[in-house]
Amino acid sequence: MLLVKMTTHIFNADDLLQALQQAKAEKNFSSVFSLDWNKLRTAKRNTSVKYVTVYVIIKGKKAPLMFNFQNEKHVGTIPPSTDEEVIRMNAENPKFLVKKRDRDPCLQFNKYKISPPLEDDGLTVKKNEQGEEIYPGDEEKSKLFQIIELLEEAFEDAVQKGPETMKTKHVIKLIQRKISNSAAKNADKPLPNPIARIRIKINSGTNILTPILLNKSKPITLQNGKTSFEELKDEDGVKANPDNIHKLIESHSIHDGIINARSICISNMGISFPLCLEMGVVKVFEKNNGIDVDSIYSSDDISTLVNQIAIA
């Protein structure tokens, strides 16, 4: 159970998904999703960067977009922030060499909760007798991924309906569907299980993680009788921070949380729609035998995409 005091409305994931699905079916995303082009805000650290507020309307409620999610599986490795950790991790797993992280960490979520059946190359999706690629059923689709996929469409639609000066700008995708064409291996090949990312922001002034992170395996009872969880800490009792986050959030951990998607960002790189973790609850989950994204693309590929989606 997430306990958080906010004046901003937090939309329910089921309600948001249903509203976006209906809007897509009716070819009318503007009935749910809109951008307030009349009130551009300037970034404090970089005056060339502008922000536009994202609004959604669900069940008669209009508010800047924040929404919750539950039971979503993070995949892949968060790169470390120190040289010492790079050396340690590469010694432990020489098959996947990491580089030092120079940007905010991200949670990564696949389209499907389980991997599609793959050929021996670990990348090509197997086909049935009719020559059709075999993918998991709808019940195996990540709800969070479905929401982000629809938000991507709604975002692009809103930009095209916005000011003329915005229509020619590069719109940065929320979903990674292909391996980067600059990757060391498998360049530009389709990912069998596309990836969406949620940014874990770091306060540049204090070097502290912006979101509150809790440990679902350590529930506590508050004075009012409600249940919450202890803050996420490492084995030495140190709270989650930029230097230990890669140890605390491992591949296949399960996450609940709140996503801040209240603004799009306009910069010289184009128009992006940053999705940032506002609050998260982490539960370590037993690893399965499915393919890990780390085995099919490099850390450079991750950094390239994070640089695009996390301009702000």
Swiss-Prot record:
Q: According to its record, what are the GO cellular component terms?
A: virion component
**Induction (free text):** Expressed in the early phase of the viral replicative cycle.
| Keyword vocabulary terms for this entry | Early protein, Virion
Annotated localization: Virion
| Family, per entry | Belongs to the asfivirus CP312R family.
Protein name in UniProt: Uncharacterized protein CP312R
Lineage, broadest ranks: Viruses, Varidnaviria, Bamfordvirae, Nucleocytoviricota, Pokkesviricetes
